[in-house]
């Protein structure tokens, strides 16, 4: 299947800082594609170049095989990290206002139901909670029935229940076969919603594939994780597959009982030990040695 969007060797510098460094990837139509990485990885600059907001120093973005131009903006919906809503008007009035900007917007009742706005239609924009505000911004992004929706860290700062409610809304957008580009710091979010993910750090793509394929490629068995204060470094050298972070130890093992015995015999303090199945955050730590939320 041909890619809906193709990113070809994008680069962007800000003075001496190489924010995006020769990045290439494709996004197939109808999938949710996750662009993951810590703050400063280059993902926001990448997404802004894809949206046509920032001009790349090198490379190009293709939409259906054609370089993006003015008409591209009519085919996408964007939910930015931060957006100022009109003050002193209600949610209902805001939807009606933005609907007037498009030749063929969704029907009012349709977008209200899609984004679960029924209970806040008469509320002033200034009085919206974080979760309500994000639902509202998503509604504005999907008003023109875009072929592609950009969601730049849409659940940052939301409480756990509001995040889960927003996931349901993204699921509804996916069900319409819209193509979604999602940036997020939350790995449970990416693992649940994304069909494919690209992991970025220092302006480069480290890995790209489905979450399941990436985890199968990099991990077998379980992960043992322990707090670490810098002691017993000589003992740790004997452990194959041991990752030593700033404040943690992580050991990948296919023989859990034997690994626990080895840790005890090495006189490693097991207080705070946890054992779990690897996830995307573990993969990022393995690739870069840093946490996704730093």
Placement of each model-derived feature along the sequence:
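Short, charged/small-residue-rich alpha-helical element at the C-terminal edge
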Residues: 220-294
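ABC transporter nucleotide-binding domain
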Residues: 168-254
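ABC-family P-loop ATPase nucleotide-binding domain
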Residues: 1-11, 290-294
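ABC transporter nucleotide-binding domains
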Residues: 5, 12-182, 187-195, 199-201, ...
């Amino acid at each position: 299947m041909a890619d809906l969007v193709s990113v070809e060797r994008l680069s962007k510098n800000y003075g001496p800082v190489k924010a995006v460094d020769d990045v290439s990837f494709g996004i197939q139509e109808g999938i949710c594609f996750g662009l993951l990485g810590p703050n400063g990885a280059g993902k926001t600059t990448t997404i802004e170049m894809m949206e046509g907001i920032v001009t790349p120093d090198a490379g190009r973005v293709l939409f259906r095989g054609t370089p993006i131009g003015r008409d591209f903006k009519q085919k996408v919906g964007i939910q930015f990290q931060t957006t100022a809503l009109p003050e002193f008007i209600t949610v209902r009035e805001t939807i009606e206002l933005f609907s007037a900007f498009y030749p063929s917007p969704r029907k009012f009742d349709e977008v209200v139901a899609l984004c679960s706005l029924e209970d806040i239609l008469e509320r002033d924009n200034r009085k919206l909670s974080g979760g309500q505000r994000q639902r509202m911004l998503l509604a504005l992004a999907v008003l023109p029935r875009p072929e592609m929706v950009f969601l730049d860290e849409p659940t940052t700062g939301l409480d756990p229940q509001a995040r889960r409610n927003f996931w349901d809304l993204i699921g509804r957008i996916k069900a319409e076969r819209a193509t979604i580009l999602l940036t997020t710091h939350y790995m449970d979010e990416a693992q649940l919603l994304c069909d494919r993910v690209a992991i970025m750090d220092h302006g480069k793509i480290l890995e790209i594939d489905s979450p399941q394929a990436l985890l199968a490629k990099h991990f077998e068995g379980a992960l043992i994780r322990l707090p670490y204060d810098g002691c017993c470094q000589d003992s740790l050298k004997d452990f194959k597959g041991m990752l030593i972070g700033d404040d943690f130890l992580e050991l990948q093992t296919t023989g859990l009982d034997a690994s626990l015995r080895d840790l005890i015999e090495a006189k490693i303090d097991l207080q705070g030990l946890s054992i779990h199945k690897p996830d995307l955050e573990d993969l990022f730590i393995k690739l870069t040695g840093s946490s996704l939320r730093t």
